[in-house]
Amino acid sequence: MCTSQISDTLFDECQNGEKAWTSDEMKQAMTNYKKLFDDGVMQDGSLSSTSYSDGTTLFLAGQAGMMLLGSWWAQEYTGEDVSDAVANWDYDYFYLPAIEDGLSDSKAIGGVDFGYGITKNCKDPEAAWKAISSFAAGEGAQEIANDMNNHLSYPNIEPDTGVMVEREGLQSAVDEFNRSGKDIAAGLVNQRISEATIETAVQEAMQGLVGGTYSVDEAAQHIQDAQDAL
C-alpha cells in the first residue's frame, strides 16, 4: 500500500532489480509504513501471527474501527450462521489515504490466487478442458461469483442474488463485491514477491523496522543484501 502511494511500479522495480531497495523512494515508503504504527493507526500486535483471526473477531464485535483485508471478505456474508454485523452489512471498504502531502491514495493491490491448466499426461484432456471452461466462464464461474470469494478474470459475471441467502445486507454486500471487482479490472498493483528469499527478507525488515530493531536505512539494506546475494 505504501509503495503504491509513491509509484504503481516501485515495488516491482525493486524486486526485479531495476531499482535498489535502498532508493530514496523505497525508504520513503518504509518511513510512511512505520509512521502508521508510530501514530497508532495500526494497533500494537497487528503484525503477529494471530492478527488476522483476532482482528476480524474484534471488528465484528465492534471493538475495532477498521481492519486490513481484501475484496474476498465479502464471502463472510454467504455463511449459513453469521453475526448480526455481517447479516446487516452496514460497512464498506476504502483505500488508505495519502500518508503525506504529494502522494496519492493507495491503489488496489493483489494478484492471481488460482490458475488452471491441463497436464501433458492427462488421461481425458477433453473432460479437463470442459471443467476448466466451466470454472472460467460457465456454471462453475457463476458458483464462484455467488460465493463472493474470488473475482473472476472473465468479465461480466456477477453474483446472482436470486440464489443467495437473503438477509438485510444482501444488496450492500453484493454491490461492494462488484465495485471492488471493477476497481481491480481498472488496474491492479502487484502484491506478489516472486523470490522466496526476498519475501522473507521483506518480512524480517518490516518486523524489525516496526519493532525498533532496524532503522529505515538498515531495513532497506537488509532487503538489498538479500537481493544482492541471489
Residue ranges and their predicted role:
Residues 61-70:
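Alpha-to-beta junction loops
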Residues 71-86:
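A ligand-binding cleft/hinge motif common to bilobed small-molecule-binding domains
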Residues 52, 69-74, 112-114:
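Beta->alpha turn/N-cap motifs
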Residues 1-22:
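Extracytoplasmic/periplasmic solute-binding protein
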